[in-house]
């Protein structure tokens, strides 16, 4: 069976209750973000809303000198990355620091760090050229620097395997909440223990309809 992207999106969304589908709304999700690139401008460390994936394209002719260097940390290392951030930021650390998009990390420093158990953080580098796409994985942390003048467009995506991946990020943040005494407040990492994410709970049970 061959499906268009619109049909596939419709089928996948229909697997989620309307109450939960209504949560997955926002700029970059139902409509793309558009960014102006300048040489040396940076995009800070972040994970996508709801731990979604993200498709990013540079809007420029193939022969132009519009490039971007990306760095990424896979979701299975996010706990170690937070350990690194707690050591580096000290009292300035917050559990939501990756969602606030205010931090730009030296990738060499992150890659060279080792945890108390001797664990390392995997840091990957990607060079994106004009008209090329970069797709980020669910819950990955990414940042980078623009190397030319142009435009970049980005839109989030999620396929059926997103739910399990986002649940894993949620469990990591539960550990962080316990270790730090802080509570997450941004929507990038959903609290799947909340009733509003419970697929077996009706809208009336959480105080209204959507």
For each feature predicted by the language model, list its residue ranges.
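Conserved N-terminal structural segment that caps and organizes enzyme catalytic cores in eukaryotes
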Residues: 1-133, 138-210
């Amino acid at each position: 069976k061959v499906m268009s992207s619109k049909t596939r999106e419709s089928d996948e969304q229909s697997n989620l209750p309307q109450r939960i589908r209504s949560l997955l709304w926002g700029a970059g999700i139902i409509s793309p973000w558009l960014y102006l690139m300048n040489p040396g401008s940076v995009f800070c460390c972040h994970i996508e809303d709801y731990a979604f994936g993200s498709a990013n394209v540079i809007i420029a002719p193939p022969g132009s000198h519009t490039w971007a260097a990306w760095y990424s940390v896979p979701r299975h290392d996010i706990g170690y990355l937070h350990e690194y951030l707690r050591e580096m930021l000290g009292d300035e650390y917050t559990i939501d620091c990756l969602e606030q998009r205010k931090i730009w990390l030296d990738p060499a420093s992150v890659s060279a760090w080792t945890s108390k158990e001797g664990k390392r953080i995997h840091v990957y580098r990607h060079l994106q050229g004009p008209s090329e796409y970069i797709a980020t994985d669910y819950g990955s942390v990414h940042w980078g620097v623009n190397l030319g003048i142009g435009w970049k467009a980005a839109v989030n995506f999620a396929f059926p395997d997103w739910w399990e991946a986002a649940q894993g990020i949620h469990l990591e943040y539960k550990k962080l909440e316990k270790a730090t005494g802080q509570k997450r407040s941004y929507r990038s990492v959903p609290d799947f223990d909340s009733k509003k994410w419970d697929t077996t709970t009706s809208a009336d049970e959480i105080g209204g309809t959507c």
